[in-house]
Amino acid sequence: MFENTNPDVMLKMKKYGYLAFWAIMVPLVPFSAFVGVESGTQDYWAWFMYAFIFGIIPVLDYLVGKDPTNPSEDVQVPTMSEEVFYRVSAIAMGFVWIAVLFYAGHIFMNNGYGLLGKIGWIVSIGTVGGIIAINLGHELIHKDPKVENWMGGLLLSSVTYAGFKVEHVRGHHVHVSTPDDASSSRYNQSLYNFLPKAFVHNFINAWSLEKKYLERKGKKNISVHNELIWWYSISALFAATFGLLWGWQGVVFFLGQSFFAALALEIINYIEHYGLHRRVNDKGRFERVTPAHSWNSNFLLTNLALFQLQRHSDHHAYAKRRYQVLRHYEESPQLPAGYATMYVLALIPPLWRKVMNPRVEAYYEGELDQLFRDGKRVNNIA
């Protein structure tokens, strides 16, 4: 639909498109709560956001189509990178999420949900949190200004996943697409094999990386200098606040939405690097990270929803680049659809392998020794 749009027009549309998307999406949260109560079917409407994100968005994403537009490196990138509007937009959306979270806690306790409805509301809000809190948190923790970096930490704390702030930057970005990275899924590895390892490793590794960092600085691990202690303390404060407002069920809601937000993140991690590995050079070392080591997706609608996270190839090659100037690389491995669609496919391993394994094999054509399966090199596809 927009593939032949004038690049300057497209960039202007996208500038306001990120907020416009969420100006439509966020009101759907109270809408689903209201319609559920008015119709007397609140237990079913509690699942609306989850169903909309992974049922309707994939269809709309396909219909809207792709966005090949890249800003010009010499003129537009320097200007756009410094525009305050983009920074304020990201931070403002962070505060919107905090408001949504507390509103959702109120609805959880006062909308007359049965067990089915309570589970559905937790899943729906957790999924929204995975998109807003963790996605924006991810964008902001890569930035140097303290206001942005701290906001990223606050957003991750709001879904009890602060370890991501440390492990992602100091662990994942260093070891991405190697067997040392638990957030890089292996060729033929199922999502359900990937998830437990990712959750456990990333939590433990975050504390290990912070400890090593503090040791290099000559500071004690268990001290006020350990940022993970601060961020997890903020998570505890969130939980305590929900407990004071709504009792033990408020705590259950907060921890439940946190789990599903983190789950959404790790499923996206599974998608982003599936089967891709940095080649081993003649010296036995992994090559440097390039746009070839992440799957790229250029579907416009989901890129607006995710602040261009799907241009993941450029993000890993140049981690400090701001979301508005991330580039599409046609030569990077390309996903056949946006993340919302790929999320659904990942839940069904046979279907996922049918779609993705041929793409991985094509990428490594003539280099099967570079493929890994279960931590071992693959010598043949069979």
Swiss-Prot record:
Q: Where does Fe cation 1 bind?
A: H138, H142, H168, H172
Q: Which GO terms describe its biological process?
A: alkane catabolic process; lipid metabolic process
Which reaction equations make up its catalytic activity?
octane + 2 reduced [rubredoxin] + O2 + 2 H(+) = 2 oxidized [rubredoxin] + octan-1-ol + H2O
Give a yes or no for keyword Cell inner membrane in this entry. yes
Mind listing the GO molecular function terms for this protein?
Answer: alkane 1-monooxygenase activity; metal ion binding
Pfam families hit by this protein = FA_desaturase
User: What is the recorded membrane topology of this protein?
Assistant: Multi-pass membrane protein
Q: Which residues cross the membrane?
A: 17-37, 45-65, 88-108, 114-134, 236-256
The record's annotation in InterPro entries points to:
AlkB/XylM, FA_desaturase_dom
Induction of synthesis: Induced by n-alkanes.
**Catalytic EC class:** oxidoreductase
The record lists Fe cation 2 as bound by: H173, H312, H315, H316
Main localization category: membrane
Q: Could you tell me which cysteines form disulfide bridges?
A: none
Tell me a GO cellular component. plasma membrane
Biological pathway: Hydrocarbon metabolism; alkane degradation
Q: Which UniProt keywords apply?
A: Cell inner membrane, Cell membrane, Iron, Membrane, Metal-binding, Monooxygenase, Oxidoreductase, Transmembrane, Transmembrane helix
- Report the sequence similarity comment from the record: Belongs to the fatty acid desaturase type 1 family. AlkB subfamily.
Q: What does this protein do?
A: Catalyzes the hydroxylation of n-alkanes in the presence of a NADH-rubredoxin reductase and rubredoxin. It preferably hydroxylases C8-C16 hydrocarbons.
The identity of this protein, by name, is Alkane 1-monooxygenase 2
